[in-house]
Design a protein with these regions (language model features):
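N-terminal export signals
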Residues: 2-8, 14-35
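Catalytic cores and adjacent binding grooves of peptidoglycan-active enzymes
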Residues: 2-3, 9, 19, 38-39, ...
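Active-site acidic/histidine clusters and adjacent loop/turn architecture
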Residues: 65-115
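Acidic helix-start/capping segments at beta-turn-to-alpha-helix junctions
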Residues: 111-125
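Charged, often glycine-rich, active-site loop that binds/positions anionic groups
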Residues: 121-138
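Extracytoplasmic/secreted envelope proteins and their assembly/folding machinery
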Residues: 96-100, 124, 155, 159
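Active-site-proximal beta-strand/loop segments in catalytic clefts of secreted hydrolases
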Residues: 51, 62, 115-119, 151, ...
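C-terminal segment of N-terminal export signals and the immediately downstream linker at the start
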Residues: 29-59
Length: 189
């Protein structure tokens, strides 16, 4: 039996390998190599609730063999659109995998509340001008960021898990009720 720390390290390494290969295969119908097969990879399934549009989406975007469902990815892109302008952006698949990895560790099967995902540059600039906490070169404008909460899981637990994975930025906005995740450089605030 492996320790929890070793399991977490193995999971993180497997996730990183799978993410890199997954990005390379995004448009293909090829399966992942054996080292990234069913044992190393939880199925890419998400249950999402958009707090702005009040929409729900339950979707399997990747099977356990690593095949991405292009229709499901398009559904996710639309679901995570800029709610201010209705513009759609291709979301970073690594962001979906990051969220899926967090869920596999702290909230498998739970619904994720999405407070913000893609923001059009125009809307982001408006938020900057209004002093609403947005930054000028936000990764939200490139589909690489998402602000989330997982009902039934403490925000501190989501934050610690995301930080442990070291897959991108993690912002603590507990007073506003969410955690920021992005696929930019590893950093915490």
């Amino acid at each position: 039996m492996i320790s929890q720390q070793a399991h977490n390290l193995w999971s993180r390494r497997a996730f990183l390998k799978v993410s890199l290969v997954g990005m390379a295969l995004i448009g293909s119908r090829l399966a992942l190599p054996d080292w990234a097969s069913a044992e190393a990879l939880p199925e890419g399934r998400l249950r999402l609730f958009n707090v702005n549009s009040q929409e729900r989406l339950t979707v399997r975007y990747r099977n356990r063999l690593g095949r991405y469902d292009q229709t499901a990815l398009q559904d996710i892109n639309y679901f995570l659109r800029c709610y201010h302008s209705d513009q759609v952006c291709q979301m970073d698949v690594q962001l979906l995998e990051y969220l899926n990895q967090i869920l596999s560790l702290v909230g498998q099967g739970k619904e994720v509340r999405v407070f913000s995902a893609y923001r059009s540059p125009t809307y982001n600039n408006l938020l900057v001008r209004l002093g609403r906490g947005a930054v000028p070169k936000s990764l939200h404008t490139t589909g690489q960021a998402m602000d989330i909460a997982i009902p039934g899981v403490r925000l501190s637990q989501v934050r610690r898990t995301a930080q442990m994975l070291k897959l991108g930025g993690v912002g603590n906005y507990a007073r506003r009720g969410f955690i920021h995740l992005d696929t930019g450089p590893v950093r915490y605030w």
